[in-house]
Swiss-Prot record:
Catalytic-site annotation from UniProt: 263
UniProt gene name: hldE
SUPFAM superfamilies assigned to the protein according to its UniProt record, in alphabetical order: Nucleotidylyl transferase, Ribokinase-like
Cross-referenced CDD domains: RfaE_like
Binding site residues for ATP: 194-197
Descriptive protein name: Bifunctional protein HldE
Keywords for the protein's UniProt record, in alphabetical order: ATP-binding, Carbohydrate metabolism, Kinase, Multifunctional enzyme, Nucleotide-binding, Nucleotidyltransferase, Transferase
Species of the source: Pseudomonas aeruginosa (strain LESB58)
One GO molecular-function entry: heptose 7-phosphate kinase activity
Length: 473
């Protein structure tokens, strides 16, 4: 499946559901209590993170999308902590605060990255469903996707009012379902149960064929647009009306904590769909995101750079021949990791030992080496009729195979100046015996604070001489 990073900055999403505070107490454990056979934790650090629907909104904002959140809290310190964390993350949160009930808090006691105990502070909310629906309907005009993040805690009382209000505006509705009655999600565009939740409704599935059959029957019964079953180490299965099932393998390299993985899936789906991605691509991105988040400890969000790196790995674009858009994403990610970008360019028609030595020297000037390659038409203009000997695709493929080269990109102009303005390398390198000011593009690079370096050429190594020698034979 071909994946690319969506324009998340053009993706407004509204999340409605059960918000909660995930609270962590971290400490050291070195002895057993004399009062009971339990470890004693000396608490050294307190940490609060948004949980439930708030974590969904946080994930959406972390991807660079616009996140709006409607939920229910108490009027207490936990609600204030939630509000402050969400505001700092760029989430537009609108809470229905209830004086007589506490904000839901999940307290986890941690030691050496292990969870020793969880304590829940919660009561089912008695929500003013009509007032909440009014808040939601007033925000629908501002968003492209509605997410119902349902943990069965009482914030969502009348799902159908919200689903029908969104459908009337042609806004897709995504629901992360809970409980034993999925009929409350009737008419949703997509629901995302995990395997356990799915089998609670349809019964145990002996194999994938049975899962698909039961899933399709459930979709028909509830008038669902699509169904995504998340299956842990077995990946995900997407079902759509009239389309074959799409099975995606799990992408996690290491699993440390599955807390909040479902939130990550639905948030990435929602943001991608709001950005204009088709559903299969959005699911592919969500699968990658889930593989990242389970490698983190506790409730966590993933960032756009993290997802971008995963996409690049998936598409094989960590190295090799890239289009300009892919290259710019790769550069952005490299810079986020403090890497110095080096650029050089040429025709590289017949690769020889001089080229290899020069490119190794160029790579040594920084952390990542980009090679800009003249396309065929520009080589002909520069070198004359009969050149290039090798097409641009073949020239780039050979360069990409060198260990010194990270990324190869072509350009159509006679000089790389336009490409340099977009790439903005930290170091521009050319080989020759002329001064820095004579290097094409030097003024562009120096204008934004970059460096220009001239490296010596390997003697008796010239493509033109090699071509002429071959012709004389």
């Amino acid at each position: 499946m071909k994946l690319s990073m969506p324009r998340f900055d053009q993706a407004p999403v509204l999340v409605v559901g059960d918000v909660m505070l995930d609270r962590y107490w971290h400490g050291a454990t070195s002895r057993i209590s004399p009062e009971a056979p339990v470890p004693v934790v000396r608490v050294e650090q307190h940490e609060d993170r948004p949980g439930g629907a708030a974590n969904v909104a946080l994930n959406i904002a972390a991807l660079g999308a616009q996140a709006l959140l409607v939920g229910v809290t108490g009027r207490d310190e936990a609600a204030d902590s939630l509000a402050n964390s969400l505001k700092a993350a760029g989430v537009d949160a609108r809470f229905q605060r209830i004086d007589s009930q506490p904000t839901i808090v999940k307290l986890r006691v941690m030691s050496r990255h292990q969870q020793l105990l969880r304590v829940d502070f919660e009561e089912p909310f008695r929500t003013d469903a009509a007032a909440l629906a009014v808040d939601v309907e007033s925000l629908l005009a501002k968003v492209k996707v509605l997410v119902l993040s349902d943990y069965g805690k009482g914030a969502l009382q009348n799902h159908q009012v919200l689903i029908q209000a969104a459908r009337a505006r042609n806004i897709p509705v995504l629901a992360d379902p809970k409980g034993k009655d999925f009929a409350i999600y009737r008419g949703a565009s997509l629901i995302t149960p995990n395997l356990s939740e799915f089998e609670t409704i349809v019964g145990r599935c002996a194999d994938e064929a049975e899962l698909v059959a039961k899933g399709q029957a459930l979709m028909s019964e509830l008038d669902l647009g699509a169904l995504l079953v998340t299956r842990g180490e077995h990946g995900m299965t997407l079902l759509r009306d009239g389309q074959p099932a799409l099975h995606l393998p799990a992408r996690a390299r290491e699993v440390f904590d599955v807390t909040g993985a479902g939130d990550t899936v639905i948030s990435t789906l929602a943001a991608a769909l709001a950005a204009g991605e088709e559903l299969p691509s959005a699911v592919g991105l969500a699968n990658l995101a889930a593989g990242i988040v389970v490698g983190k400890l506790g409730t966590a969000a993933i960032s756009a750079p993290e997802l971008r790196r995963a996409v690049q790995r998936e598409q094989g674009s960590e190295r090799g021949v890239l289009g300009l858009e892919q290259l710019l994403l790769a550069i952005e990610d490299a810079r986020a990791h403090g890497e110095k970008i080096v650029f050089t360019n040429g025709c590289f028609d017949i690769l020889h030992a001089g080229h290899v030595t020069y490119l190794e020297q160029a790579r040594a000037q920084g952390d990542r080496l980009i090679v800009g390659v003249n396309d065929d038409a520009s080589v002909t203009r520069l070198k004359g009729v009969g050149r290039p000997i090798n097409s641009v695709d073949r020239r780039m493929a050979v360069l990409a195979g060198l260990g010194a080269v990270d990324w190869v990109v072509s350009f159509a102009e006679d000089t790389p100046e336009r490409l340099l303005e977009q790439v903005r390398p930290d170091v521009l390198v050319k080989g020759g015996d002329y001064g820095v000011e004579q290097v094409v593009g030097a003024q562009i690079v120096k204008a934004y604070g970059g460096e220009v370096r001239v490296l010596g050429l390997v003697e008796n190594s010239s493509t033109t001489a090699i071509v002429e020698k071959i012709r004389q034979r």
